[in-house]
A protein has these predicted regions:
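Short glycine/serine-rich loop segments
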Residues: 104-105, 109-230, 414-415, 419-426, ...
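Acyltransferase
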Residues: 21-26, 56-59, 102, 271-297, ...
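Short, well-ordered beta-strand elements within core beta-sheets of diverse protein domains
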Residues: 10-16, 95-99, 214-221, 341-346, ...
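Gly/Ser-rich catalytic/binding loops embedded in alpha/beta enzyme cores
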Residues: 2-175, 284, 289, 294, ...
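Glycine/threonine-rich flexible loop motifs
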Residues: 88-98, 272-273, 385-393
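Glycine-rich, small-residue loops and helix-cap segments
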Residues: 17, 73, 166-167, 346-470
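Short helix-loop capping/hinge segments that flank enzyme active sites or metal/cofactor-binding pockets
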Residues: 71-94, 253-262, 311-366, 378, ...
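A short helix-breaking turn/cap at a secondary-structure junction
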Residues: 191-277, 459-469
Length: 470
C-alpha cells in the first residue's frame, strides 16, 4: 500500500492516525531486506529491535501529543561519513574501521529529535570521486542496471531513495556528489548554498578567507518530498558560525523565468553522446510551456575555473586527510592519493591565486544572474559506466587527463557556491538515466526547489520506477 505514496501522503496518514509509524518503518525495513542485497546501498544497519522499539515509542508519544514535526517517525539513513555515536565511521577505508565516534554529528543529533535512524549509506572511499565503491563495503549498483555505477560519492543514498528503501536521504556534495548520483538514478539531488545546512567544520590553517566548497545535500524522488527533509535540516545553528537561515522566495510563473543554457560552456566540456540531446529535448518542451530559454555564450574560461577548483579542492582534502592520522598513505585509493599529493605541494600563494580567480568569476556570475533566473548544464559528462571500473578513462574517444576530469561539469556551482538541483531528463537507448543541473544565485535555494516542483508537475519523472526494484 505504501509503495506508491509520496512523503506528503505518508506524513498526512501518520498525523491522521490512519497508519502507525511502526507500519511505515516495517514497510521500509521489508524493502531493505528484499532489495538492498542486490544494491548494496545501505551498508551499516542499526539493530532492528531498537528501530522497531523506537517506532512503537514514537507512536505512543504521537497519541498523547500530535503536534510533531513533519518528519517525525520517518526512517533515515545517513551517509557513512556522518558520525553516529558508538557506530563505526570509516569512510570506506579499512584503516579507520576502529574509528568509533563518541558523539553524533550535528546532522545526526538533529535527526534523532524526530526521525528514526536505521543505518548508513554507502560512499566512494573517503567520498572522493563519482563512483560509489570502496574496499570495506564494496560497490553500490545502479538501480536501472546492476552492472553499472550508482555514481558518487553519495551513490548509496541516491540508490536507496530511487529503490524506495527510504523516503529521502542526505548526501554531501563537493564536486557533484549529490548531483551525479541523482542523475544516475532518475531522482532529484540538491547541492544547497554552503552554510544553508549546519555542519561540523574544520578551518584551513592560516587561511581565514578559504571559501566553503562542500555542503550537505538532499535526495528525493520528487522535489516536494525533498522539501520535507530540506526544510527540517536547513537553517542556522549556533554550533556552526558559518550557517545561516534562508529567506523565502515568492514563486514566479514559468513564463516569467529565463534559463541560460550553458551547453558545453563555449565548447569547453566534453559529453558522452546522447547527453546533450536529452537535455535539449527537455528544454524544447519547457519552451513549449512558455519558459524562456537562451543558448548562453559567456566569458567564463573553464581552464581558469579548473585551476582554481583543483587547488582549493586538493588543499581542503589534504588538510582533511591530516586529521585522520593515517599510518600508511600508500594504501589510499588512487583518487584520494592524487588529492593528498597535490594538496601537499600547494603553497599559500597558490591558494590566494585560486581565491582571486574565484572572486573574479563571482563578479561575472552576478552579472549573468541580472539577465537569467537560472543557468543550466548537464548533470554528468558520462552515462552510468561499468561498476567494476576503478575510474572512467575516456569521454567518447577523448582521454581523461586526471581522475576527475569527467566531473568537471560540477565546478561552476561548486567553486562559486551556487545552489543547484539535478533534475531528471530521461533515458538513453540503453535505459540509463541522465539529469540536468538547474543553477541559481547564492542563497536562492528555495528558488531552484520551487522550479523543480513546477518541472515535476509537467514531466512527472517520478512515475518512472526501476523495474529491477519492483
Amino acid at each position: 500500500m505504501l509503495e506508491n505514496f509520496s512523503v506528503h501522503q505518508i506524513i498526512s496518514k501518520i498525523k491522521d492516525r490512519e497508519i502507525k509509524i511502526a507500519e511505515v518503518i516495517n514497510f521500509y525495513l521489508d524493502r531493505i531486506k528484499k532489495f538492498n542485497p542486490k544494491l548494496n546501498a545501505i551498508i551499516s544497519h542499526i539493530d532492528e529491535t531498537k528501530i522497531t522499539e523506537e517506532a512503537k515509542l514514537k507512536d505512543e508519544n504521537f497519541n498523547s501529543d500530535n503536534d510533531k514535526d513533519d518528519i517525525y517517525g520517518l526512517p533515515i539513513a545517513v551517509k557513512e561519513l556522518f558520525d553516529i555515536k558508538n557506530e563505526v565511521t570509516c569512510y570506506g577505508y579499512k584503516e579507520l574501521l576502529k574509528n568509533i565516534p563518541k558523539q553524533n554529528s550535528l546532522l545526526v543529533d538533529n535527526y534523532k529529535k524526530n526521525a528514526i535512524l536505521i543505518g548508513k549509506t554507502n560512499l566512494s572511499e573517503f567520498a572522493v570521486g563519482c563512483h560509489t565503491t570502496n574496499r570495506v563495503y564494496g560497490a553500490t549498483s545502479n538501480v536501472y542496471d546492476h552492472s553499472k555505477s550508482a555514481g558518487g560519492s553519495s551513490g548509496g543514498a541516491a540508490a536507496a531513495v530511487a529503490a524506495n528503501l527510504i523516503p529521502f536521504a542526505d548526501g554531501t556534495d563537493m564536486m557533484g556528489s549529490c548531483r551525479n548520483p541523482a542523475a544516475f538514478a532518475n531522482i532529484y539531488g540538491l547541492r544547497p548554498t554552503p552554510g544553508a545546512i549546519a555542519e561540523d567544520r574544520f578551518e584551513i590553517k592560516n587561511l581565514k578567507d578559504f571559501p566553503l566548497i562542500s555542503t550537505t545535500g538532499c535526495f528525493a524522488r520528487t522535489p516536494n518530498d525533498m522539501e520535507f527533509l530540506f526544510n527540517y535540516i536547513k537553517g542556522r545553528n549556533v554550533k556552526d558560525k558559518l550557517s545561516f537561515d534562508l529567506k523565502d522566495i515568492n514563486n514566479k510563473k514559468l513564463s516569467d523565468l529565463k534559463i541560460g543554457w550553458c551547453i558545453d560552456l563555449n565548447e569547453q566540456y566534453k559529453y558522452e553522446d546522447g547527453i546533450i540531446d536529452l537535455c535539449e529535448n527537455i528544454l524544447k518542451k519547457l519552451q513549449s510551456n512558455n519558459l524562456n530559454i537562451e543558448d548562453l555564450k559567456t566569458e567564463i574560461n573553464s581552464e581558469e575555473l579548473w585551476y582554481s577548483w583543483i587547488i582549493l579542492r586538493a588543499k581542503f582534502l589534504y588538510e582533511n586527510f591530516l586529521l585522520y592520522n593515517l599510518k600508511n598513505l600508500n594504501e589510499l585509493p588512487s583518487q584520494a592519493y592524487w588529492e593528498y599529493e597535490k594538496g601537499k605541494s600547494i603553497k599559500t600563494k597558490d591558494v590566494l591565486k585560486a581565491i582571486e580567480i574565484r572572486n573574479k568569476y563571482m563578479d561575472k556570475i552576478q552579472n549573468l544572474f541580472k539577465h537569467y533566473d537560472f543557468l543550466a548544464l548537464p548533470s554528468a559528462q558520462l552515462f552510468p559506466f561499468e561498476k567494476n571500473l576503478n575510474n572512467p578513462e575516456f569521454i567518447n574517444d577523448n582521454k581523461i587527463d586526471t581522475y576527475h576530469r569527467y566531473m568537471e561539469v560540477y565546478t561552476l556551482s561548486s567553486l562559486l557556491g551556487l545552489p543547484t538541483i539535478s533534475i531528471p531528463v530521461g533515458f538513453n537507448n540503453k535505459g540509463l538515466p541522465m539529469g540536468m543541473q538547474i543553477i541559481a544565485n547564492v542563497k536562492e535555494d528555495n528558488k531552484v526547489i520551487n522550479f523543480a516542483n513546477s518541472y515535476e508537475e509537467i514531466f512527472n519523472f517520478s512515475k518512472f520506477k526501476p523495474k529491477l526494484m519492483q
